Amino acid sequence: MKKIFTAFIMMLCAACVASAANYLTFTAEEDGSTFGIVNKNNNPDVQYSLDGGETWTALAGGKMVTLAHKGDKALLRGDNPEGFSKDTKKYSSFTMTGMIAASGSVMSLIDGVGETLVIPANYCFYNLFVGCKSLTKAPTLPATTLSKRCYAF
């Protein structure tokens, strides 16, 4: 009984952490929408969850993730304390098909939860959504301390 109670408490704590975080979130606005990441001489840590933050999978460059049904969501996070992209020759961009609305904070790609308000490096989110014609809504850009060309495209 004690093991069951402990497991329940651990699951409850994990759910609280997932709901408290402000993850970058992609929501399908039509069936079969997809997203992926293209890395140009760059390899940031990016993970996604399709089950509300219970399990996380690394988002590898060139891999497309399908949001099968309208309303399906993907949470995104990363551990990139020195910045997501580096400069005009070393950066990563999302790629999308279908129709996808973004919400939450891009800062979850930096600190894993979307709490930091400081852009850690120049060019941090350079070209992040360049060419994403499928993006119907932009995410929150909450940083209050910016750096050179941090949101440039």
Identify the residue ranges that each predicted region occupies.
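Noncatalytic modules at the cell exterior or secretory-pathway interfaces
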Residues: 33-35, 65-82
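Structural motif
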Residues: 37-42, 77-80, 113
